[in-house]
C-alpha cells in the first residue's frame, strides 16, 4: 500500500491509494462517513484495467478536524474492528 497525495487544502485531501481495490476502498469510505466532521468521502477508480488497484479518494471535512485526522481515526476504527472479528473467531473455534 502506498499513498500518493494529489491535492491538499485546509479541509480537503485528494490522494491515490495504490495497491488497493474496491474492497478496502469501500471499507475506508464507509468508515469515514461515520465521522460527523466528514462532509464528503468518496473514491473512484479512473480506469478499470490500468488503474484497477489505484483508487482515487477525496475527503472533505467541516474544518473542525483535518482530513488527515479523519483518515487516522478511520484507520484506527478499521483496525479495532478487525481485532474484534479476530477475537470473536478465536472464541468461536475454541
Curated annotation (Swiss-Prot):
Key words of the record: Cytoplasm, DNA-directed RNA polymerase, Nucleotidyltransferase, Transcription, Transferase
EC number assigned by the record: 2.7.7.6
Keyword set includes Protein biosynthesis: no
Compartment(s) where it occurs, according to its Swiss-Prot or TrEMBL record: Cytoplasm
MF (Gene Ontology): DNA binding; DNA-directed RNA polymerase activity; protein dimerization activity
SUPFAM superfamilies, per database record: RBP11-like subunits of RNA polymerase (SSF55257)
Family note: Belongs to the archaeal Rpo11/eukaryotic RPB11/RPC19 RNA polymerase subunit family.
Protein name: DNA-directed RNA polymerase subunit Rpo11
Recorded name of the encoding gene: rpo11
Amino acid at each position: 500500500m502506498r499513498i500518493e497525495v494529489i491535492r491538499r487544502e485546509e479541509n480537503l485531501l485528494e490522494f491515490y491509494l495504490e495497491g488497493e481495490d474496491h474492497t478496502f476502498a469501500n471499507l475506508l469510505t464507509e468508515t469515514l462517513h461515520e465521522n460527523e466532521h466528514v462532509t464528503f468521502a468518496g473514491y473512484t477508480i479512473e480506469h478499470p484495467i490500468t488503474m484497477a488497484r489505484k483508487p482515487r479518494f477525496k475527503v472533505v471535512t467541516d474544518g473542525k478536524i483535518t482530513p488527515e485526522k479523519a483518515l487516522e481515526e478511520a484507520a484506527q476504527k478499521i483496525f479495532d474492528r478487525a481485532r474484534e472479528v479476530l477475537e470473536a473467531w478465536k472464541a468461536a473455534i475454541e
